[in-house]
Amino acid sequence: MPVLEIDKEYLYSLLGMRLSRDELVEILEDTKVNIEGFSDESIELEITSDRLDLLSTEGIARMIKGIIGKELGIPKYPVEHREEELVVDESVKNVRPFAVGAILLDVRLNDSVIKSIIQCQEKIHETLGRKRRRVAIGIHDLDAVKPPFRYIARPMDEVKFIPLGENREMTAREILENTEKGREYGNLIRNEEGLVPLIEDSMGRVMSMPPVINSELTRLSERTRNLFIDVTGTDEKSIRTSLSILVHSIAETG
């Protein structure tokens, strides 16, 4: 089962209050999480498979607020359905067939929020995602690109972009052969046609090559205010559940 590392100061900021060690332990021991570690700075919690909504610090904060009576009931967030924002092309059918997306506006990111979002993303990859085989998530700076977006498969030698963490443009083949993420996850999209799945913006710029790596183009920073999230995979129910978990977690940041 996944183990989540909780930054206590960030947790307190989400709660809007501080709790003593004894109070936190008492609350957590009455829930479906197991305390694996507890220090002055952080808490390590093992999350059970039936509470994947707790795969983030924000999810833990939401649960605690309900237990202590600070916020009761199911949280409600303003939602606008914009189906035109992500078009799924027929070419991905035999590569990695399903994709969903969401846009989140006016998000306030700082180091703690970014770390928490990325941790939630990776925990989803490990659990529901089956190490990205079933589900993979990309999180992008919306203001760096132009919607609508397209999920499409193209020949790997015709695809070029700067992968996240690199400083030069590479072909998709080079990324799969020469980068750490490419070697680790490239086997998940290998096919006889030599196609790779891509998320592109309306100008044809590559945002990600799921489930392998994002583009440097949409890297998150503390200046990022608007997000686009893509979730791709081989099981439609799992990608929708994963998107819901992550979007609700980010919404809790305010």
Segments from the language model and where they lie:
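RNA/tRNA-interacting regions in translation and RNA-turnover enzymes
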Residues: 1-254
